[in-house]
């Protein structure tokens, strides 16, 4: 009987040892910080990571938009505009306290710049009342080259902007109504930014800068919107 008790006790002790060994095999120890760093690369950079371990979003490069547009501009001024520069300086106020579609804003600027060259006085005699009226309407389809990133979806719906403007010796009001949408036409289109519509390249570049656009000439002589401030 004494031998039997010793045998059972010895066997139980051996079973516990086996269970302990099996337990260490069934459950791996948690990975160390170094293991995680080596096996998983987060999209956000970690302090101390090498540049070649970081993830970057690829640039979309130069994009081409086919746009359908219509722009109607009406401006009142207490004095006639002396030159194109003064006219465009007044027109830039159309976007004061801008509350329209953010993604469309750079392209609105390009279209309004294009329309500015078409300004005409409504009635020269109206100056007798201390106000000069200018108006211009443009519409059609055109190309826009840009490197501003992803283009927004654009539906051909109108937006209206009415603002007061004041530049040194002149002031008045401006009203802009503009439609802008994409088109899938297969017809050949002219670029909206074209020096042919201006006195020269310099006038177009300066006008774009006043409107908040930085434009650059490409190798094929087309003009690219590189920045919108």
From Swiss-Prot:
<keyword id="KW-0946">Virion</keyword>
<feature type="short sequence motif" description="PTAP/PSAP motif">
    <location>
        <begin position="42"/>
        <end position="45"/>
    </location>
</feature>
<dbReference type="GO" id="GO:0039660">
    <property type="term" value="F:structural constituent of virion"/>
</dbReference>
<keyword id="KW-1035">Host cytoplasm</keyword>
<comment type="subunit">
    <text>Homomultimer. Interacts with viral nucleocapsid; this interaction contributes to the virion assembly. Interacts with the viral envelope glycoprotein; this interaction contributes to the virion assembly. Interacts with host RAE1-NUP98 complex. Interacts with host NEDD4 and TSG101. Interacts with host dynamin. Interacts with host NDUFAF4; the interaction inhibits viral propagation and is independent of interferon activation. Interacts with host GTF2H5; the interaction may inhibit host transcription. Interacts with host DRG1. Interaction with host CTDNEP1. Interaction with host ABCE1.</text>
</comment>
<dbReference type="GO" id="GO:0044200">
    <property type="term" value="C:host cell nuclear membrane"/>
</dbReference>
<feature type="short sequence motif" description="dynamin binding">
    <location>
        <begin position="2"/>
        <end position="4"/>
    </location>
</feature>
<dbReference type="GO" id="GO:0019031">
    <property type="term" value="C:viral envelope"/>
</dbReference>
<keyword id="KW-0468">Viral matrix protein</keyword>
<comment type="similarity">
    <text>Belongs to the vesiculoviruses matrix protein family.</text>
</comment>
<keyword id="KW-1043">Host membrane</keyword>
<dbReference type="GO" id="GO:0030430">
    <property type="term" value="C:host cell cytoplasm"/>
</dbReference>
<keyword id="KW-0945">Host-virus interaction</keyword>
<dbReference type="Pfam" id="PF06326">
    <property type="entry name" value="Vesiculo_matrix"/>
</dbReference>
<dbReference type="InterPro" id="IPR036711">
    <property type="entry name" value="VSV_matrix_sf"/>
</dbReference>
<keyword id="KW-0597">Phosphoprotein</keyword>
<dbReference type="GO" id="GO:0016020">
    <property type="term" value="C:membrane"/>
</dbReference>
<dbReference type="InterPro" id="IPR009397">
    <property type="entry name" value="Vesiculo_matrix"/>
</dbReference>
<keyword id="KW-1048">Host nucleus</keyword>
<keyword id="KW-1198">Viral budding</keyword>
<protein>
    <recommendedName>
        <fullName>Matrix protein</fullName>
    </recommendedName>
</protein>
<feature type="short sequence motif" description="PPXY motif">
    <location>
        <begin position="30"/>
        <end position="33"/>
    </location>
</feature>
<keyword id="KW-0472">Membrane</keyword>
<keyword id="KW-1187">Viral budding via the host ESCRT complexes</keyword>
<dbReference type="GO" id="GO:0039702">
    <property type="term" value="P:viral budding via host ESCRT complex"/>
</dbReference>
<keyword id="KW-0053">Apoptosis</keyword>
<comment type="function">
    <text>Forms a double layer around the helical nucleocapsid, the inner matrix layer binding to the N helix and the outer matrix layer binding to the envelope glycoprotein. Plays a major role in assembly and budding of virion, by recruiting cellular partners of the ESCRT complexes that play a key role in releasing the budding particle from the host membrane. Condensates the ribonucleocapsid core during virus assembly.</text>
</comment>
<keyword id="KW-1188">Viral release from host cell</keyword>
């Amino acid at each position: 009987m004494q031998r039997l008790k010793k045998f059972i006790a010895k066997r139980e002790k051996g079973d516990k040892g086996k269970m302990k060994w099996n337990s260490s095999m069934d459950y791996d120890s948690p990975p160390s910080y170094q293991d995680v760093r080596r096996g998983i690369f987060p999209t956000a950079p970690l302090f101390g990571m090498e540049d070649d371990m970081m993830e970057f979003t690829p640039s979309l490069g130069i994009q081409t938009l086919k746009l359908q547009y219509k722009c109607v501009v009406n401006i009142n001024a207490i004095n006639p505009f002396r030159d194109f520069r003064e006219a465009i300086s007044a027109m830039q106020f159309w976007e004061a306290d801008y509350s329209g579609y953010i993604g469309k804003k750079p392209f609105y600027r390009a279209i309004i710049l294009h329309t500015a060259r078409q300004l005409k006085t409504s009635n020269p005699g109206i100056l007798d009342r201390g106000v000069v009226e200018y108006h211009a309407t443009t519409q059609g389809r055109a190309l826009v080259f840009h490197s501003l990133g992803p283009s927004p979806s654009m539906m051909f719906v109108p937006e209206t902007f009415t603002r007061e403007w004041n530049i040194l010796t002149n002031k008045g009001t401006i009203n802009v109504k503009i439609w802008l949408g994409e088109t899938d036409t297969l017809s050949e289109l002219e670029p909206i930014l074209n020096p042919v519509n201006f006195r020269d390249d310099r006038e177009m570049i300066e006008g774009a800068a006043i409107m908040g656009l930085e434009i650059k000439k490409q190798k094929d002589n087309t003009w690219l919107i590189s920045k919108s401030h």
